[in-house]
Structure formats: C-alpha cells, structure tokens
Regions:
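A general structural motif
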Residues: 81-82, 152-154
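A short His-aromatic
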Residues: 132, 136
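Short "lid" loop at the C-terminus of a central beta-strand within the Rossmann-like core
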Residues: 162-167, 184
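Conserved N-terminal segment of class I S-adenosyl-L-methionine
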Residues: 1-127, 131, 144-145, 160, ...
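Conserved dinucleotide-binding and phosphotransfer motif residues
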Residues: 103, 150, 198
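Helix-to-beta-strand junctions that scaffold the AdoMet/dcAdoMet cofactor pocket
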Residues: 137-138, 151-153
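Conserved beta-strand signature within the Rossmann-like core of class I S-adenosyl-L-methionine
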Residues: 155-162
C-alpha cells in the first residue's frame, strides 16, 4: 500500500494496517492526522441508521453534562463577544443548541442528515460549534474552511473530538475508532496545523478533546 496525501497538511501519510478489522488507515507523522481508507467509509444510509441508535436527548444526563462542560470550557470564557451561534452537525437531537438558547444566545442548527436546510449561506456567526463532528468528516480541512467563511471577523470555532493516542499500537487498541462512522482522528498538533493553513488563531487546545480557534479580524 502506497502513502496517501495528508488531507490536512499535504505531506505523505503512511499506511497503517489494522489486523483486527482488516482495513487500512493512513497516518501523517507531520501533523498527526489519521484517516481511514476511503473505500471503507460507510454509506450515508448506514451512517444515518447508526446515528439514530444514539441516545442524544435532554433526558440523557450524561450527554447533557458533557455539553455543560463543553460550554464552560470553550464558550463562557468568550461569551461577551458572542451573540449569534451555529451548532454545526447537531444530530437528530440538538441538545447543545437548546442549552445555549437557555443562556440567551441566538442559535441556528445544521446537520447534513437531520437538519439539512436550516443553514443560510448568507448568514455569519460569532461562534460555530462542532461537537463530536470532526471524527465523521471525510475532508476536515475543507469543512473547517467552510465554517471559517461563515464566521464574523474574530468569530470563534469551538471543536470537540477525542484526540487519538498517537502510537500505532495504542491507536489499534483505541475504543473510539471502533465506531464505523469515525473516519478522521486528530491530535492537538493537527489542529495547530489546520489553524495555520486557514488563518485561524488558536485560543485554546487541551490534551483530551477540545480546540478553540478564532478567525482573523479585518
């Protein structure tokens, strides 16, 4: 298997064979992005069916607590500059959007499967959230570029996706990749490179799953 072009930094990504599931991933040593062989990507129909199995509702206390922690760490520190929000990839139950509305933010939602017509191409936002979204993206750089273009100057992109453990052996034993809809995996370094390529300024990256970036002002 030959190397593939990294979708984040364009360097060569070497093949990583998964003996258990008999599939190839590709690992970029420059930016640490890992992505699945495209022929293994599940169909939209299967992807939707898998999403519908999730218990992502306001009645799920653990799910709500996850978003409350996300809000506390990535949104509240910048709340004075945020009025209009887009919850990108909100899924069938837009819980984060509801929690933000309760705090007084104006919130739009978008999901390519469940709310595909709710985004206005002419709108721009002070904040775009993408929680548990980037691991599902076939081309995360282009999606991030699209989101950047919907941000106001100095607008914020807040991302939550679990960072992969790095070493090949650890990655192969990592539970997070067992979801067949998870096809892209990141580390903090990946988002630093992505931000540099798209003209974002990194405001915060933790060591687990969070990244906050700011679009350049005019």
């Amino acid at each position: 298997m030959e190397t593939r072009r990294c979708k984040i930094c364009a360097a060569g990504a070497r093949p990583l064979w998964d003996e258990k599931f008999k599939i190839f991933y590709f690992h970029c040593s420059r930016c640490q992005y890992i992505f699945i062989d495209e022929k293994e990507i599940v169909s939209p129909e299967k992807e939707i069916a898998l999403y519908k199995q999730h218990n992502n509702t306001l009645e799920n206390e653990g799910y709500v607590n996850m978003f409350e922690a996300f809000i506390s760490k990535t949104i509240l520190p910048y709340q004075e500059r945020i009025k209009r929000v887009l919850d990108f990839g909100c899924g069938p139950g837009p819980v984060l959007a509801e929690l933000l509305k309760r705090r007084g933010f104006e919130v739009d939602i978008y999901d390519p499967y469940f709310y595909p017509e709710t985004i206005c191409e002419q709108k721009s936002y002070d904040l775009i959230t993408a929680t548990e979204v980037f691991e599902h993206l076939k081309d995360p750089l282009e999606t991030a570029r699209l989101l950047r273009d919907h941000l106001n100057p100095c607008g914020i992109l807040a991302v939550m996706t679990l960072f992969h453990p790095g070493e090949a052996s650890a990655f192969k034993n990592w539970w997070y990749r067992h979801d067949p809809t998870h096809i892209s995996f990141f580390q903090p370094q990946t988002f630093e490179v992505l931000a540099d390529r798209l003209g974002f300024r990194v405001l915060m990256i933790d060591s687990k799953n969070l990244c906050v970036m700011e679009r350049a002002g005019k």
